[in-house]
Amino acid sequence: MIVLMFCRHVGVRMYAIFGFCDIHHFEDVNEKLGKDIMTFVNTIAAVVHNYVHEWKGQSNKNLGQAFLLVWRIGDEQTLLELLGSRKDAPAQQIQQPNAANAAKAAAIAKKKAAQIDLRRVPGVDALADMALIAYCKIIVELNRSKDILAYRKDPRLTMNGAHEFKVRMGFGLHAGWAIEGAVGSLQKVDATYLSPHVNMAARLESSSKQYGVPILVSQNFFDLMTEEGKSRCRRLDVITVKGSEVPIGIYTYDALQDRRFKSKRSKKKEDRSVDPIPPVFLSSDSDTIEVFENDYDMRSLCMHVTPAFLEAFQTGLELYLQGDWATARGHLERADRLMAQVPHKDGDGPSQTLLRYMDAHGWQAPSSWKGFRPLTSK
């Protein structure tokens, strides 16, 4: 007779910034590298873990080709006391894995969601900035690390030199609550986070492919950033996701990966003629506003974005959201043409995504249009 023993640890409701990132084309790489896939994954994991840790985050789970990342804001009770909302309220304990308790937890979550305004938490704006900066640093390192660049010439991945292979990842960021606790049995227990907000981070990562950008962040996350951080992000769309009727804005930090990035050990005289950006590399000890303004990596990633492009896209996006699709088309097509002038860019992914959506509807907003659309891919 087999006796089923499950973990009876309780979970605690907490708030955090949740990140999810994924290695693109992993199945194909796995098949071609065979036993060397472990070295490939661990080389990338070292980059992800290093920059997430440096920029005040934690790597919670390694899922083969994907990573769940957490920038912890605080448990519910601590935040309620900090913000003076309910100083006498006990921390909510949720017994696992009882279905009735799960339903109760969901009801409590919905009721309490409006009680904690994360924007009021001291230091949360800098923490949000650091989560985005960590992602940008990872993207740069994937295109700077000699160990990772070596895969570009690996004959197993390039069809014996027929083309160049590039390591690419997708990244999602979202903020909200989760139940923090142990999941498993006496044989295997994992510390993890369970919540629709964790799922949303994964959904954003997956959708980054649809928009042709490496990074997608939600309105929930965007609202936590400093004004400087917000000014560096581009709003792409307003969407709803499966299981929710609440519209949410999505944003990106424009990142041009196909370029040469200096390292901290670069010789200034050799690089100055080909790269006008001063080699200033700032750490997490620096003010995040200064990092956005002066850090070499952050500036290099978005140096291809021009005021003319931003004006064309933003105008087109606003017209699209207002339902004037015929006029929006011209502005978004112009934005796409401007981005296509950038070396190694085949136009602007977000512009192309919106244009395809409007084209599928005959360039006429449906009569039921309310300024948002369902996200069709998970």
Task: Give residue ranges: language-model regions.
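Intrinsically disordered, glycine/charged-rich C-terminal tails and inter-domain linkers
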Residues: 93-108, 163, 168-169, 177-180, ...
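Generic non-transmembrane alpha-helical segments
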Residues: 40-55, 134-145
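Nucleotide second-messenger and two-component phosphorelay signaling modules
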Residues: 7-13, 32-35, 50-57, 159-162, ...
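Regulatory cytosolic signal-relay segments
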Residues: 1-14, 50, 92-111, 122, ...
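Catalytic-site or vestigial catalytic-site microsegments of nucleotide-handling domains
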Residues: 15-28, 74
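Conserved long alpha-helical elements within nucleotide-processing catalytic cores of c-di-GMP signaling
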Residues: 27-49, 60-61
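Catalytic core of nucleotidyl cyclases, primarily class III adenylyl/guanylyl cyclases
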Residues: 20-21, 55-130, 140-196, 220-231, ...
